[in-house]
């Protein structure tokens, strides 16, 4: 059974259709890259799958449980939606760290709040220990007490990845995680994501890094104009695209 099943997702902003009948599934432990030009719908799709945007139509299921059905009001209650978001970790383009908190505090804050409000039984000590271990995995053992303004863009994005992983999500979403970085800092973030893929972390990554998508992702979806033009195994889609629109898009990158 697929860990994630997305069926017939549609989204409009006003009268403008942004997502048109999007359907796909993802197996546990796989990495899926979503590629496409700016404005193709990648970010909106990720936001709909994390309920930061509400789809106008469609069904989203995780592990066989229907989390959202546009035709079922019971799946759209805001209090329930907040809990359903815990299935997903989100890494944003622009880091979105809290400037008033250290790297370690950014990573552990949500878990600490949940332990208090939901009475999860977790101790503050265990949450801090896990947060430190995550930052060590990100190569930031010596930056735990630094504030965001004291970190490079690449370091901030690695903190953001650790923060998302700290909530132990079923699926990690990364929305163009290197787009706000200088070229020399891109590699350190891609290295971290590559390591997560090797550890079979279930991920969906919106990216403009074609070589990275080819080498790291198990599956690739190419979007254009709010529709899925082509999808399949990453190397098949990128090395031997079947659709003319996909070939045209990828040819621009091969010429760079």
Residue ranges and their predicted role:
Residues 101-110:
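Short coil-to-helix segment of the ABC ATPase nucleotide-binding domain corresponding to the Q-loop/switch region
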